[in-house]
Amino acid sequence: MSELRIPIEQWQSLSSAEQTQRLARPGRAQAESLREKVAVILSDVRDNGERAVLNYTRQFDNPDATSLRMSDEQVEAAVASLDDKVKRAIDTAYQTIYRFHEAQRPQDLSIETAPGVQCELRYAPLDAVGLYIPGGSATLPSTALMLGVPAQIAGCQRVVMVSPPNKQGELPAALLYAAKRCGVTDILLCGGAQAIGALAYGIESSPAVGKVFGPGNSFVTEAKQQVSQNDSGCAMDLPAGPSELLVIADDSANPAYVAADLLSQAEHGPDSQVILLTPSMTVAENVRQELMAQCAQLSRADIAEQALQASRLLVVADMNEAIAISETYAPEHLSIQTDNARDLLPQLTRAGSVFVGHYTPESGGDYATGTNHVLPTYGYARNYSSLGLVDFYRRYTVQEASHDGLRQLAEAITTLADVEGLDAHKRAVTIRTETKSTESKL
C-alpha cells in the first residue's frame, strides 16, 4: 500500500471539465468498446447453441467441460459438504429477504371508469426466468438469494441459474445451497455473454427464458442489453455492472466506518468505484489514513487497491453541494453517515439503495437486511429502480363494457377515430351501438 496515492480534492477548485471527469465511471468507456465482441458471441450462441456455449466455457472457465447442466445428484453431493454455520447464515438471509419481498406482492385492481365500463389491472408471474450469478474471484450465494427469493415468491415455473464454473467444473457449495433453498429448477455451468445468450435464445439442454436477471461484468451487462433489444423476445431486469458506493459524511462520522464501507465495495473488483463527499478536510484526511491501513489487511488488497485508483475523496462546501453531486452521480449504493442522516433522505432520491446512519453498513444490504442488492449502476439510478418482486411479474389490463357502457363512450371513441382517420376503429363501435343489445336483463 505504500505506493498507493489517494488524493483529496476540493470540489470547488476543480473546473467543470475536471468535475465531470472525477464522476466518470472507470468501466464505462470499456463497456462501449465491447459492443462488437459481445455481438459476435451472441450470434455464435444463437447459431450454434450448446456447442458454442461449451466452447466458450472450455476457453474461459473449465477446459474439460463436456456438459453444461448440473444434475440433482451433483447439487445434493455439493450441498451435503457445506458447513452448518454457512447454512444457518444463508437461512437467516433467506428469511429477511423473503420477508421484505413477500410484503411487495402486487395487488390486482378493478375500477369502473364510466357507467357500465369496468377496467382491471392484473399481474401474472413470468413463466421462465434466468438468473445470472457472477463467478470469478468471489463466491456469491447472496446474489442467488436476491434473485431466487423473488422468483420463488412470484411463482415462476422455471428458474434457470447460470454461473461460471471453476477449472474443475464445479460451483461453490454455498451457491448451490442458496439456489436449492430458493427452488431453482435448472443450473447451467456457464458464464459471461455466452451464458446470457444461452438463456435468451435457448440451447439443447435448456429452453429459452423470458427474462434475464442479475449483475455482471461489462460483457454480461452489454449482452443483457443486446438480447433485450433484438427479436429474441427476452427482457432484462436493469443495467447492473461494476459496484459503486458514494458516502456522504460529516464531522459526526467515524472515519474507520467510512473507510470500511468504501473498501467493502472496492474489493468487489478493479472496475468498482467508491467516492467520499464531506465538507470536512479533517474527515477526508482521517478516512484516507484508514483506507491505507485497512486495505493493507485485506485478503483482496490488490483488487481493492486497483479500484481505489479510480476512486475519489472530495471535500465539498456544504451538505447542499454534497447532495447535488450525489444526485448528479446517481450511485448504485449511497451511504449517509451524518448526524441528521434521515433528514437528508427526501433530497436524495437518485440511488439504487440508501444506507442511513452510522450503524448501517453497506454490506448489510449486500447480505441480510432484506433489501435487494441487484441495483442499477453507471448512473442508471436516475431512471431505473432497484430489483423488486414486481420485476418477476407481467402486468396486463382487462376491460369489459356493457352495451349501455359502450354507448356512454361511443361519441368520444368515434370522434377520436375520425380525428385519426381510422374508419375501421369507428365502425367497430357503431356496428355495436346501432344494433339492439343481446345482453340478458335479469
Curated annotation (Swiss-Prot):
<keyword id="KW-0028">Amino-acid biosynthesis</keyword>
<feature type="binding site">
    <location>
        <position position="425"/>
    </location>
    <ligand>
        <name>substrate</name>
    </ligand>
</feature>
<comment type="pathway">
    <text>Amino-acid biosynthesis; L-histidine biosynthesis; L-histidine from 5-phospho-alpha-D-ribose 1-diphosphate: step 9/9.</text>
</comment>
<feature type="binding site">
    <location>
        <position position="425"/>
    </location>
    <ligand>
        <name>Zn(2+)</name>
    </ligand>
</feature>
<feature type="binding site">
    <location>
        <position position="132"/>
    </location>
    <ligand>
        <name>NAD(+)</name>
    </ligand>
</feature>
<keyword id="KW-0479">Metal-binding</keyword>
<comment type="similarity">
    <text>Belongs to the histidinol dehydrogenase family.</text>
</comment>
<dbReference type="GO" id="GO:0008270">
    <property type="term" value="F:zinc ion binding"/>
</dbReference>
<keyword id="KW-0520">NAD</keyword>
<dbReference type="InterPro" id="IPR022695">
    <property type="entry name" value="Histidinol_DH_monofunct"/>
</dbReference>
<feature type="binding site">
    <location>
        <position position="268"/>
    </location>
    <ligand>
        <name>substrate</name>
    </ligand>
</feature>
<dbReference type="InterPro" id="IPR012131">
    <property type="entry name" value="Hstdl_DH"/>
</dbReference>
<feature type="binding site">
    <location>
        <position position="243"/>
    </location>
    <ligand>
        <name>substrate</name>
    </ligand>
</feature>
<feature type="binding site">
    <location>
        <position position="366"/>
    </location>
    <ligand>
        <name>substrate</name>
    </ligand>
</feature>
<comment type="function">
    <text>Catalyzes the sequential NAD-dependent oxidations of L-histidinol to L-histidinaldehyde and then to L-histidine.</text>
</comment>
<dbReference type="GO" id="GO:0005829">
    <property type="term" value="C:cytosol"/>
</dbReference>
<keyword id="KW-0560">Oxidoreductase</keyword>
<keyword id="KW-0368">Histidine biosynthesis</keyword>
<dbReference type="GO" id="GO:0000105">
    <property type="term" value="P:L-histidine biosynthetic process"/>
</dbReference>
<feature type="binding site">
    <location>
        <position position="265"/>
    </location>
    <ligand>
        <name>Zn(2+)</name>
    </ligand>
</feature>
<dbReference type="InterPro" id="IPR001692">
    <property type="entry name" value="Histidinol_DH_CS"/>
</dbReference>
<feature type="binding site">
    <location>
        <position position="366"/>
    </location>
    <ligand>
        <name>Zn(2+)</name>
    </ligand>
</feature>
<feature type="binding site">
    <location>
        <position position="268"/>
    </location>
    <ligand>
        <name>Zn(2+)</name>
    </ligand>
</feature>
<dbReference type="InterPro" id="IPR016161">
    <property type="entry name" value="Ald_DH/histidinol_DH"/>
</dbReference>
<keyword id="KW-0862">Zinc</keyword>
<feature type="binding site">
    <location>
        <position position="265"/>
    </location>
    <ligand>
        <name>substrate</name>
    </ligand>
</feature>
<dbReference type="GO" id="GO:0004399">
    <property type="term" value="F:histidinol dehydrogenase activity"/>
</dbReference>
<feature type="active site" description="Proton acceptor">
    <location>
        <position position="332"/>
    </location>
</feature>
<feature type="active site" description="Proton acceptor">
    <location>
        <position position="333"/>
    </location>
</feature>
<feature type="binding site">
    <location>
        <position position="217"/>
    </location>
    <ligand>
        <name>NAD(+)</name>
    </ligand>
</feature>
<protein>
    <recommendedName>
        <fullName>Histidinol dehydrogenase</fullName>
        <ecNumber>1.1.1.23</ecNumber>
    </recommendedName>
</protein>
<feature type="binding site">
    <location>
        <position position="420"/>
    </location>
    <ligand>
        <name>substrate</name>
    </ligand>
</feature>
<feature type="binding site">
    <location>
        <position position="194"/>
    </location>
    <ligand>
        <name>NAD(+)</name>
    </ligand>
</feature>
<dbReference type="GO" id="GO:0051287">
    <property type="term" value="F:NAD binding"/>
</dbReference>
<feature type="binding site">
    <location>
        <position position="333"/>
    </location>
    <ligand>
        <name>substrate</name>
    </ligand>
</feature>
<dbReference type="Pfam" id="PF00815">
    <property type="entry name" value="Histidinol_dh"/>
</dbReference>
